[in-house]
Amino acid sequence: MWFGKFGGQYVPETLMEPLRELEKAYKRLKNDEEFNRQLDYYLRTWAGRPTPLYYAERLTKKVGGAKIYLKREDLLHGGAHKTNNAIGQALLAKFMGKTRLIAETGAGQHGVATAMAGALLGMKVDIYMGAEDVERQKMNVFRMKLLGANVIPVHTGSKTLKDAINEALRDWVATFEYSHYLIGSVVGPHPYPIIVRDFQSVIGREAREQILEAEGDLPDVIVACVGGGSNAMGIFYPFVKDKSVRLIGVEAGGKGIESGKHSASLNAGEIGVFHGMLSYFLQDEEGQIRTTHSIAPGLDYPGVGPEHAYLKESGRAEYVTVTDEEALRAFHELSRTEGIIPALESAHAVAYAIKLAREMSRDDVIIVNLSGRGDKDLDIVLKVSGNV
């Protein structure tokens, strides 16, 4: 329930019953043979696991220094790591006897992943989305509807993600007998950060086996981008006990920390309570959640998962920032040297890995979690970069 002093269940009494029910069911099902057999089946045959660990030889040569490997979550069905958690939680809900999934989404990626999992398992899906985001993300809204989901625009407050979260929670309190609230990252009240981490840690388990096979040794460094933090937690967790492996999370530096236009909760935030958990958040003097900025829609979250807060405080992981500009450069670099167009989120991790590789020796090994593909970001890049 707690990661050091972080985490917890900072929720109204009305949410305690559904959370207790979820915790009990997860404890029962996580080692259940039939549940795991079905999860493994869908991950393999529907989602396309295991994803490859790819040695980026041309990028490595160009950069000079450490070998750079990419864990190819961009090749997962749906185009990003989000699918691991969506199918895991949807199956969990089905085993609990639920018939409906509720989720909130900002950029739309988590909504799409939830809609995919709901369609696969024959469940009703309702997605809450800030009215402003509905306007900005027309293609993802269409995708969700195509997959059979009902998209509910939220017109309250700032009409963005945090308002969508409030509406989704309100719905869950009223309907939890037959609904499951599917959180998309390692955030929220206990047991969500643990559940999401466990479903995502398939990334790290595979990467560990794959790097031992390729190099005969563990990597020196693992680099992953951090918004809420689920792709990073997924690749970090199976390596946490290996003290020789440096774990580096890359936050969105936006237009630079000094500018105030960023999403770097661990580097520039303060400890507070939001979304049912104690963690680091970007807050103003009054403790109100600040508006965030990142060129990568998926890093635009004003907080971070409690386990990351704990890994930072305990010194087990390091957290750095990469600006919009640096991420864009890495986006183009990887596209041109390896023929892989990364998501802008993942490009933050690539950018830091390039910087780091230059300072390391040729015998050293870096694994980058390439958490998603960049098709969804082409409009953004076109606007910012103009003709490539």
From Swiss-Prot:
One Pfam family recorded for the sequence: PALP
N6-(pyridoxal phosphate)lysine, modified sites: 82
The UniProt record lists the keyword Lyase: yes
GO molecular function, one term: tryptophan synthase activity
Cofactor(s) essential for the protein: pyridoxal 5'-phosphate
Pathways per UniProt: Amino-acid biosynthesis; L-tryptophan biosynthesis; L-tryptophan from chorismate: step 5/5
Reaction(s) catalysed by this chain's protein: (1S,2R)-1-C-(indol-3-yl)glycerol 3-phosphate + L-serine = D-glyceraldehyde 3-phosphate + L-tryptophan + H2O
Group of enzyme by EC: lyase
A GO cellular component entry from the record: cytoplasm
Superkingdom field: Archaea
InterPro entries linked: Trp_synth_b_CS, Trp_synth_beta, Trp_synth_beta/beta-like, TrpB-like_PALP, TrpB-like_PALP_sf
Keywords: Amino-acid biosynthesis, Aromatic amino acid biosynthesis, Lyase, Pyridoxal phosphate, Tryptophan biosynthesis
EC number annotated for this UniProt entry: 4.2.1.20
Complex and partners: Tetramer of two alpha and two beta chains.
Described purpose of this protein according to its UniProt entry: The beta subunit is responsible for the synthesis of L-tryptophan from indole and L-serine.
PANTHER family from the UniProt entry: TRYPTOPHAN SYNTHASE, TRYPTOPHAN SYNTHASE-RELATED
Family membership noted in the UniProt record: Belongs to the TrpB family.
Name recorded for this polypeptide: Tryptophan synthase beta chain 1
Species per Swiss-Prot/TrEMBL record: Pyrococcus abyssi (strain GE5 / Orsay)
Gene name, Swiss-Prot/TrEMBL: trpB1
